[in-house]
Amino acid sequence: GGVRFTDFHSGAPSCSPSRATFLTGRHHYRAGVYSVITERLHKMHLLESETTIAEALKENGYATAHFGKWHLGMPVNNRKNPTPADHGFDYWFGLVNGPGPSHKNPTQFLRNGKRVGQIKGYSCQIVVDEALTWLNEKRDDDEPFFLNLWFNEPHAPIAAPDEIVSQ
């Protein structure tokens, strides 16, 4: 059983606004995200007043988890921006923006708000492994779930295992 969403149309031509539209189902301006979020330049973030799909599903008994790039504002640089937990995700493993310094052996991942430190491997594989661990070990098998997974790889600098690149 369940529902598989297979036909999403981007709400904007860039990263952060599209993510805001995906989570809220509303125009990104209304959700508070009007351009790509550059943490050093402004405090823009997904407004806490917006209801996300994760919040709606959580209220209806779903386990919710986010994996990968968030890029909707985070409490970095002493800011009080909301985290994925503030938008309905029970569990999250992700990035404020990029994996830094590269997709290989990244250092910027957070797990439920706590820095993880350097992880060996490539960010795409790390995110999938974490999501699979959550699916197989951390969630209640009898509970419906919503898993949101956003890869960082569409953004430079691109790095991937040689066996994938060679294909």
Question: Where in this protein do the model-derived segments appear?
Answer:
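Formylglycine-dependent sulfatase
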Residues: 1-167
